[in-house]
Each structure stands twice: as C-alpha cells, then as structure tokens.
C-alpha cells in the first residue's frame, strides 16, 4: 500500500531526527505529511525549531531535494526510490507508525442518491481491479505509465520495492482516531 518516507538531503549529513533543528522539511499543510511530521517528532528534542515548508507538488519536492534546496522532504513511491538512489537517507517511514492515511471518501449525500451509488460501485470495482492488476503484475509492468506521469527513469523503476495494494475498505478506527486528533490540534 501507500506509505510516506521522510528523506533527508545527503549533503546535510543528518543521521537522526534530533539533528533536524533549524532544518526545513517539505510537506503539505493539513495533510498526511503534516500529521506524520507531528507524529515522528513527538518526544524528539531538537536544538531549535524544525521548519515545515508547504510544497504541495511532490515532483517539486523531489527536485528541491536533488538540487540541495531542501533539508528533508516527505515522499511516497516511486519518488522515494528516486531519492534513495541518489543517496538521500530515510529518516522516518509511515509504516513504522502503523498508520494508513490514504482513503477514498464520499459525501453522505452522494451515497444516498441511487445514481451516485451506482457510480461509486463502478468506481470501487475499477479501483479494486487496478489493485489486483498491480499486485499480480507488479509496478514494473506499468513502466511506461510511471515514466510518463512520474518522470522517472528505468533505473528507478527497476529499483522499486514490491508493494501490495489494498482494495477499498473501511478505514481502521485507530487511523481515524489519529487523524481526528491531528485535526483537532492543528486545524483551528
């Protein structure tokens, strides 16, 4: 499934989260990466403030890391692999927090409408079929699409870790609770 990694710039020579004081992290405010930043730095003592910089576009985040313009960035696959191949270090991984923040959300009004319910059922079926295809064939099978949309090379595609994509399912209560706690403390 989807996971996020906090990757530090190899030129910054950061080895531990407590060294991130006075450093900039590219992420998206009020999002999974913002929540993860809060969680990974809980209880971590840094000499000074860690600066969360809002860079919404993950392609731009990767380019900023590769161009030494950012100390650390939150990325998911396949861009995390591209960064690791360039020697950038994984400082944190959302899988370590046992947190899954990716959801497909629908408004109650949409679910109440019969025509919309039919569309949502078709969407869910197509999504689950895509997951099955990815799980059966692997990401490398879709290398042309990865190159086109993510602008990554064959080397990165060949280095991608094996991933398991999950069907649409109800979110786990633990994940809902963590997201709600984050929203309560962050969004005013």
What kind of region is each of these model predictions?
Residues 7, 61, 102-103, 167-170:
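Short, solvent-exposed polar/charged micro-motifs at secondary-structure junctions
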Residues 52-53, 57-146:
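Pocket-lining segment of extracytoplasmic ligand-binding domains
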Residues 1-47, 52-55, 61-64, 71-77, ...:
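Short, glycine-/small- and polar/acidic-enriched structural segments
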Residues 11-18, 41-42, 48-50, 62, ...:
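Proline/Glycine/Serine-rich low-complexity intrinsically disordered segments
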Residues 112-187:
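Secondary-structure end/capping motifs
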């Amino acid at each position: 499934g989807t996971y996020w990694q906090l990757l530090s710039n190899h030129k910054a020579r950061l080895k531990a989260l407590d060294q991130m004081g006075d450093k900039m992290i590219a992420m998206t405010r009020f999002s999974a990466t913002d929540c993860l930043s809060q969680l990974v730095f809980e209880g971590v003592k840094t000499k000074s403030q860690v600066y969360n910089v809002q860079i919404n576009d993950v392609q731009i985040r990767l380019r900023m890391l590769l161009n030494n313009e950012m100390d650390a960035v939150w990325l998911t696959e396949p861009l995390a692999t591209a960064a690791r191949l360039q020697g950038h270090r994984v400082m944190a991984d959302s899988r370590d927090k046992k947190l899954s923040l990716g959801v497909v959300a629908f408004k109650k009004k949409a679910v109440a409408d019969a025509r919309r319910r039919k569309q949502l059922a078709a969407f869910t079926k197509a999504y689950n079929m895509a997951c099955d295809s990815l799980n059966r064939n692997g990401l490398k099978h879709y290398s042309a699409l990865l190159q086109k949309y993510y602008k990554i090379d064959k080397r990165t595609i060949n280095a991608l870790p094996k991933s398991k994509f999950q069907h649409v399912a109800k979110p786990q209560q633990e994940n809902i609770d963590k997201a709600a706690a984050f929203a309560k403390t962050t969004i005013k």
